[in-house]
Structures are given as structure tokens and as C-alpha cells.
Amino acid sequence: MRSATVVTRFICGAAFLLTLGWGIPVHAQLGVGEWVRTDATGKGMTMTVAACCKGGFRLTYRVPIANGQPPLILTVDLPMDGTEVPTMSAGKPTGQTMSARRVDDHHYTGVVKQNGQPYLTSNATLSADGKTMTIEDTLTGTNQKVIETWVKK
């Protein structure tokens, strides 16, 4: 069974990075919709991106859990202005926050904190057609990296 901390460690980099590039009107509709994580570590995870919060995005993750249990559902309302925002599960904060910055039209960077302490940095690259996002997550204080691949449905 995947714990919420392990799961969110691998998906939170994508949470805000996937949509960060669409915080300006020209790109506003590119990120909205359903995304599927296709790498081996995150296979089966989905993310729904919807507009919210004055030009930001609501991200809803569905994370498969072993033994036929219902999926873990995580939600974050991301204002897209670099503000730290909480990750929610069942309407309650998980103790995790996210913040992010857009570098350019196809590159994004961000930090995920757990209980106020940074534990994950992410660098993302959006494909030219806007249909694939590759994210390199690095655990704070280690050389451990996870490469995520998300594809728009």
C-alpha cells in the first residue's frame, strides 16, 4: 500500500509544475483537462486540472491504492503566483505545501514542503505540443531523483 507521504512526494512536483505555465491567458486552456502519469513509479495516477482561484488551477489527483482500496484523492488549489498552498486530502490539510515559478513557456521549477520543511524540488519541461510533461524531482538533502512523465488525455 502506498502511504500519502510517499505518493505525494512523487506527484506534488507535477501538481503545480504541470499547470504553472498556463497561468497566463495565452496558455490558459492548455493545461485544463485530464492527465495520466505513465512512468513505472506513478503508473495509474491521474490528475484533473480545472480553472479556479482567480486565474489559478484546482488539481485533483487520484492515486491507486493496493488491495482494491478506493484511490487516495489529493486536491490543491494553486493560485499560480508563487504562494505556498496546502495539499488537501478529504478536505483536511496533509501538512504539505507547494510553491512554484514559471521559468519560461516550457520550463518550471518549484518546492514542496512537509510540515514547513523543504523536502522536494522539481524541474519540469513541457513538450512543444503541450501534451507531455517530464518532471525531475530531487529529494532535499539527497541525490535521489525521480523522473515523472505525464501525458494529456
Describe these PLM feature segments.
Residues 11-22:
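Bacterial N-terminal signal peptides
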Residues 1-8:
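N-terminal secretory signal peptides that target proteins for export/translocation
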Residues 5, 15-16, 27:
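Intrinsic disorder/low-complexity segments
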Residues 27-153:
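Hydrophobic small-molecule pocket/channel-lining residues, especially in calycin-type beta-barrels
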